[in-house]
Regions:
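Carboxylate-rich helix-loop segments that flank metal/cofactor sites and access channels
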Residues: 68, 78, 83-93
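Charged, amphipathic alpha-helical coiled-coil/dimerization segments
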Residues: 37, 86-149, 153
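N-terminal helix-turn-helix DNA-binding core of bacterial DNA-binding proteins
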Residues: 34-80, 160-166
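Amphipathic alpha-helical recognition patches that constitute DNA-binding helices
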Residues: 24-28, 55, 105, 131
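N-terminal leader segment of winged-helix/HTH proteins
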Residues: 1-47, 166
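Short amphipathic alpha-helical interaction elements located at domain edges
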Residues: 142, 153-166
């Protein structure tokens, strides 16, 4: 099968109302997700973190949990979480300690460097989020965030990050 080439008469993507996919919610959400993700990833890259690594650090900064509990809270599957914690451990941001109640279980803990990096990452992530959302009128922004929250903690509350098989 040959390479697909877009038609030369395709409209620019910035013609929102007239774009052929302007009523496709999945496509729209994907574009927003990609835009947020690209900006956040670029900001976190300066701190030598991925978005997923920041999510794990952020959860660890808030709760004392086993690795299994951490995965459930962050909605990251076991394989992806193991890879993420391995990376954070190599960077000196996390250590794994045996759970005193179950020696088979591990409790990831932030190192002092991990705590500092998490705080910095949270600041830059919030700045990126605010820069993006500040482009919306306040009432629209509140409705947008409220609607996302309803979906995230409602019908998509069990959605999980899955390890990429590459």
């Amino acid at each position: 099968m040959g390479t697909m080439v877009p038609p030369t008469d395709a409209p620019p993507l910035d013609e929102a109302a007239d774009h052929v996919l302007s009523d496709d919610v999945n496509w729209l959400l994907n574009r927003v997700w990609l835009g947020f993700g690209e900006r956040r990833a670029a900001a976190l890259d300066a701190l030598d973190l991925t978005v997923r690594e920041h999510v794990v650090l952020d959860v660890l900064s808030r709760v004392d949990a086993t690795q299994l509990q951490l995965g459930a809270i962050a909605r990251i599957d076991k394989s992806a979480l193991t890879l993420t914690i391995d990376s954070l451990e190599r960077k000196g941001l996390v250590v794994r300690e045996p759970d005193p109640r179950d020696r088979r279980a591990k409790r990831p803990r932030l190192t002092p460097l991990g705590r500092d990096r998490c705080a910095a990452a949270s600041r830059v992530s919030r700045q990126v989020q605010d820069q993006i959302l500040d482009s919306l009128p306040k009432a629209t922004r509140e409705i947008f965030v409220s609607t996302l929250r309803e979906y995230a903690f409602g019908q998509f509350s069990q959605a999980t990050y899955v390890a990429q098989s590459r």
